[in-house]
Amino acid sequence: VVAPAGLKPLAETECVFCGQCVQACPVGALSEIDNKYPVWRALNDPSKTVVVQTAPAVRVAIGECFGLEPGSISTGKMVTALRMLGFDKVFDTDFAADLTIMEETTELIERVKKNEKLPILTSCCPGWVKFLEHQFPELLYMPSSAKSPQQMFGAIAKSYYAQKIGVAPENLVVVSVMPCLSKKYEASREEFSHDGVRDVDIVISTRELADMIREAGIRFEQLEEQEYDSPLGESTGAAVIFG
């Protein structure tokens, strides 16, 4: 019998939205959610300002999709490709990762001073968070209250940045390019929406970005290198280890 663990219906499993079931299903009954077309629609909507953030791991993995040596860092080519696809601004999730580090450090200092809610647990992985919620609900006081870099970026983009460029939050579309499918689930959580407007509107995987680049007829390996946009494209080296 082919079924989830414990023969439970899929909707009743303690799913952490990692996406591995798609790869492991022996009969090919599952498929990932494809978010390329919502991105294309946003890019072709003249009423929307569309910005994109890319996770650190994407700049390495994207090169392999186009035949570059494994481990090749393709940051500049990736930024160029994203601009050619039509994104108004290309930003780096590392900017928000630096903020996450500062927020978590501040929170740890306060907890140590008050000697409460220790130890502090931290992870930007939504699968890990969901696993904790499923398996260890009695420990939910331990994780840091800081958002993941993806969600912190979205919150900043829909507030500070939207105000800075004079665009209403509902007309600013934030797209994330992430190495993990669970980031799609994270962006959909209720606590990351305000007045019906999501902090991060659409999440695509590295492979989906590669598909979009091919669909646009872009020769990735031949691209010149460009830099991220300012101010949300600036970061320190410490942020890169978030992945």
Set out the residue ranges of the language-model regions.
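Iron-sulfur cluster-binding cysteine motifs and their immediate structural context
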Residues: 1, 14-38
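Short helix/strand-bridging catalytic loops that position acidic/His residues to coordinate divalent metals
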Residues: 2-9, 138-144
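Immediate flanking context of iron-sulfur cluster ligation sites
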Residues: 5-16, 167-177
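Iron-sulfur-associated redox domains of electron-transfer enzymes in respiratory
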Residues: 32-243
